Amino acid sequence: EMLYKQKIINFRIKNKIIWGLKRVNNEIIKKKFKFNYDLEDIHMNIESRLFELIGEDAGYIHTARSRNDQVITDLKLWLKKATKKIIILLDSTNSNILKLAAKNVMTIMPGFTHLKNAQPISLAHYLLAYVEMFKRDKKKFKNNLEFLDENPLGVGALTGTSFKIDRNYTTRKLKFKKPTNNSVDTVSDRDFVLDFLHSSLVCSLHISRIAEELIIWN
């Protein structure tokens, strides 16, 4: 759509490409898409299928973009979706823990240190410790969204493109907050992946701790 808006491709080509991509998307959703594992990755599979559907006009999807900015854009979109889903799940988990804690303010149990009885403790107070852990996890994931919300599309292989593209338009269409600032940094940046992995690791340790303590209590 941006290429058409900028008069880089015509109306006919734009419609053919959009129709083809929607067809591919439906095939993937319905699990009817036939992946060719001899091709490099999902992008090449989609491109190959698009050529089958609309012919040589599929070649225009290469216009004003590179594999470099395409892969990073897809990765950020996936991580944004996953991060927002995790935040919702953390909110739901904390809500359920709070409800359970409210019912057990006066439930007294042994508190453990080094797997031995240490001090008496309210079950509610113990449960609220997990609420604090998951609140920190949520904050980490929300902080990650700041960098995931920068649109890489349009930086090309390294130094942009000679086509008169509109990165602000693709930013709005893809629901990013703003375009990235520097093309060289953009194509080499994977910090946001490490941020997501770190947040996920810490969160998984908290979940593992709950599971371990439930096993001990039983």
Predicted regions span which residues?
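A helix-coil-helix interface module used to build multimeric assemblies
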Residues: 1-160, 165-171, 178
